[in-house]
UniProtKB/Swiss-Prot annotation:
Species of provenance: Mycoplasma pneumoniae (strain ATCC 29342 / M129 / Subtype 1) (Mycoplasmoides pneumoniae)
Origin: domain of life: Bacteria
Record CDD domains: ABC_cobalt_CbiO_domain1
Name the UniProt record assigns to this protein: Putative ABC transporter ATP-binding protein MG303 homolog
Record domain ABC transporter: where: 72-312
Listed GO CC annotations: ATP-binding cassette (ABC) transporter complex
Amino acid sequence: MQTPQIIWSLIAPQYRGLANKVNRKLIQSSIKHYFWYCKQFDKLVHPFYYLTAKKHTPLFNQQLVDLAQSTLYFYNLSVFVDKSNAGQIIKNVTGSVEPNQITVIFGPSGSGKTTLIKQLGLVENPTCGFLNCGNFYYFANQKHNRATKQFQNSIGYVLQKAEEQFLCDSVLEEVLTGAINLGLCQKGDVNFAKKYLEMCGLHHIPLIKNPLELSGGQKKRLALASVLAMQVQFLILDEPTVGLDQEGKALKSALLKQLKQVTRIMIVSHDVDFIYETADSLIQLEAGQIVDQMSVADFFNNMQLLQRYEITPPLVVQTIQLLQAKGVQLNDPLAIKTVHDLIDQLKPLFHDQ
């Protein structure tokens, strides 16, 4: 692992002199000394903490800007089972999550997918490495400060089992609680709640109903509505299609594609058909390491990659391959994401006959 370096192009001009000094310190620090800094003095609160340790106030992260439209970078992230650095779960991964895109973390069970998204959302703290988004930097083992809290408030996390994040006894309270805590609405604001319930297809649900009495699909949509009500800039969903029928998956896909216009979205999923229809980019994990990062279309149309990872192609990709093997020439195969897209490209062929 290399010691982290501050990305020069992301530093405002007035801070570049400070950044240069910090980079020199990081270059001179061995890995052993780097961890010693983290564990003994906990001085890596942000890139410039070296220079402000006595004041305990950040010079750079006082007010976060451009989170929604900035790429989220992660560098050399590692996660160990315990403080003795035994049992490495995530192994020095580096990558990025682009704004206005849906990025999927993909890989076999036990590869570290859920662990990775928890680090990126700061639900859990990485053992080493750092995150950067806009003018926000977060180093492993640092103390949480105002900037960290602001970044965390910009993130919405929807668990695989939605009921595990329910806190209230009614649908109305469940949607409003997080937004009230952030000062976005008042208690009992029915119109505010209805806006997000309608967005998630729950306009017909009684507001006084207990969330635990909803169906599995409705619970997932309610959990999403409560997160969206907090007006997050980064949405993380763990296995969003588990327990959903085809109609529910189609609704979820359409909603996420609409939401990506105003936020970045990261999902963990094994559902190749949903991924192919919905996501833009893919990060492939194997045994805690990133082995590929590319567009979803390129990944699922690369038969060598799919064979290497023993992945069954999405149904629509299999259908396209069968048609092409029969000599059917499609206008733009990579643009076909759903059966409806395929039918639209096949219609002119039948009309020509």
